[in-house]
Amino acid sequence: MSASAPAAEGEGTPTQPASEKEPEMPGPREESEEEEDEDDEEEEEEEKEKSLIVEGKREKKKVERLTMQVSSLQREPFTIAQGKGQKLCEIERIHFFLSKKKTDELRNLHKLLYNRPGTVSSLKKNVGQFSGFPFEKGSVQYKKKEEMLKKFRNAMLKSICEVLDLERSGVNSELVKRILNFLMHPKPSGKPLPKSKKTCSKGSKKERNSSGMARKAKRTKCPEILSDESSSDEDEKKNKEESSDDEDKESEEEPPKKTAKREKPKQKATSKSKKSVKSANVKKADSSTTKKNQNSSKKESESEDSSDDEPLIKKLKKPPTDEELKETIKKLLASANLEEVTMKQICKKVYENYPTYDLTERKDFIKTTVKELIS
């Protein structure tokens, strides 16, 4: 019974292979999850496609600029400190050299004195008003000025020395010390004012012109004498040729001996007459040359006598000196109204006082003296 029971059980429940089992069907939840995943993938693909398509213009990046907020520096008002020495405009030689220099050449000197380049209108005036540095030797400011001067070239230092009436010889360090020592306590050198070269050159030109004229006159006189001598030589040659031609003719036309004896005295007479004519021509030429030489010498002596006869006052006439000009300017300024009179009018009046001389070259001196007298 026990054996039959399992058999019966086997018959009742038929066995199936594992492969033949039916696949399990997915539930509703799993299907919904799959659909959501597919939708997400589609959205990602669409976004990628959109990113590839460029729509419109590209936005430019804005340039970020740095804005420096600089605080406006207020310049200190320009003041000229009173120094221990004399003002540069009061020293005659320095005032003279300042008037000769251009404003561009004085910029470095102005910067050295006042730590600023200065304007064109007030540059020379400010340099002239300088009377010395207010600080003492060996201070911090003194060292700064020394460093500033060391940066200048030798040519610039020498031009500053020229303006300040100092020696221009020496090395860079010597020039720097010389300039600083003077600027600490400016004082006059005691040398006289340099003479203007224009007046000297004018006189030398006149002398050269007069000597040149005399040389030209001598050269023109010499050819005249030579021409006279050459003309006399030509006359002599012509006479010689004529005599030689006559002699040839005589030799060709020789008659018989009898006639020759009779004609000989006639030929001698003709030759003698020709010789006398030659001598007369030579004497005339010599006399003409001597007469011309005498006339030229007479003219020269007359011109010398006429120059000697001139009064000595004419020979000794010279242009007015600086002192004379200064006195005339003083008189003109004393009689003139300074509020109405211009510099041009004063210059014209000075020229009128000396009409025989050309004083246009001394115009600068007249102007400087007027300014000195007014100040």
From Swiss-Prot:
Gene3D superfamilies assigned to the protein according to its UniProt record, in alphabetical order: Homeodomain-like (1.10.10.60)
List of residues that carry Phosphoserine: 19, 32, 51, 72, 121-122, 159, 201, 204, 210, 227, 230-232, 243-244, 251, 287-288, 296, 301, 303, 306-307
Keyword set, alphabetical order: Acetylation, ADP-ribosylation, Chromatin regulator, Chromosomal rearrangement, DNA-binding, Nucleus, Phosphoprotein, Proto-oncogene
Post-translational modification: Phosphorylated by CK2. Phosphorylation fluctuates during the cell cycle with a moderate peak during G(1) phase, and weakens the binding of DEK to DNA.
Modification N-acetylserine, positions: 2
DNA-binding region extent: 337-351, 367-371
Tissue expression as described in the entry: Ubiquitous. Expressed at relatively high levels.
UniProt GO BP: chromatin remodeling; positive regulation of transcription by RNA polymerase I; positive regulation of transcription by RNA polymerase II; positive regulation of transcription by RNA polymerase III; regulation of double-strand break repair; regulation of double-strand break repair via nonhomologous end joining; regulation of transcription by RNA polymerase II; signal transduction
Protein name in UniProt: Protein DEK
Modified residues (Phosphothreonine): 13, 15, 199, 289-290
Residue ranges of every copy of the DEK-C domain listed in the record: 319-375
A molecular-function term among this protein's GO annotations: DNA binding
Entries under SUPFAM superfamilies matching the protein: DEK C-terminal domain
Subunit structure: Found in a mRNA splicing-dependent exon junction complex (EJC) with DEK, RBM8A, RNPS1, SRRM1 and ALYREF/THOC4. Interacts with histones H2A, H2B, H3, H4, acetylated histone H4, non-phosphorylated DAXX and HDAC2. Component of the B-WICH complex, at least composed of SMARCA5/SNF2H, BAZ1B/WSTF, SF3B1, DEK, MYO1C, ERCC6, MYBBP1A and DDX21. Binds DNA.
Xref: InterPro entries: DEK, DEK_C, SAP_dom
Annotated stretches, region: Disordered: 1-61, 184-325
Biased composition (Basic and acidic residues): 19-30, 48-61
Compositional bias (Low complexity): 278-296
Clinical disorder: A chromosomal aberration involving DEK is found in a subset of acute myeloid leukemia (AML); also known as acute non-lymphocytic leukemia. Translocation t(6;9)(p23;q34) with NUP214/CAN. It results in the formation of a DEK-NUP214 fusion gene.
Role this protein plays: Involved in chromatin organization.
Record-annotated disulphide pairs: none
Subcellular location: Nucleus
PROSITE patterns listed in its UniProt record: DEK_C (PS51998)
Span(s) of short sequence motif Nuclear localization signal: 205-221
